[in-house]
Regions:
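Membrane-interface extramembranous regions
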Residues: 1-153
């Protein structure tokens, strides 16, 4: 199971680096079209949202590949939160029938929506991010971190 987790984590990290790079280059306009209308204050801001999310995706991808255990787990938990945060863009694509990334039917766009929980699960499971996800859910993450700092002093 250890090697399955490792391989899936490396694949997820590579996927994130690829996706982030595509935000910055060859799929940029398709990502611009996917930005929900409530974030489209201006064309410049919409483009900024796409570019910023691309940089964040690259950082997460590299983080879950190269960071050491505890930092990797934090990166995985943050990546799961990122997947939750960008989910409205996927819903926007479905609701407004936006063709992008080969998703040119409502059925394909709907199927994509069901893959978001899979990505959230993979981010948490392959990195060990469950621990931090649970602490955040209970509102205890910062208390745990400050307790570690106090014990080290």
């Amino acid at each position: 199971m250890k090697y399955v987790k490792l391989i899936l984590r490396l694949l997820l990290g590579a996927f994130m680096v690829y996706a982030g790079t595509s935000h910055l280059t060859f799929n940029r306009q398709e990502f611009v079209a996917q930005v929900p209308t409530y974030l489209q204050f201006s064309p410049t801001f919409t483009d900024f949202v796409v570019l910023a999310s691309g940089v964040v995706e690259i950082a997460f991808g590299l983080g879950i590949i190269f960071l050491v255990k505890n930092w990797r787990a934090i990166a995985g938990a943050l990546l799961a939160l990122f997947y939750v945060a960008i989910f409205p863009g996927n819903i926007n694509q479905y609701v407004n029938h936006i063709d992008a990334f080969g998703l040119n039917t409502d059925n394909l766009r709907l199927i994509r929506l069901f893959f978001q929980p899979v990505l959230i699960f993979l981010a948490l499971w392959t990195t060990g991010g469950w621990k931090y996800w649970k602490l955040w859910a209970k509102g205890k993450f910062f208390a745990e971190q400050s307790g570690k700092a106090e014990r080290k002093e």
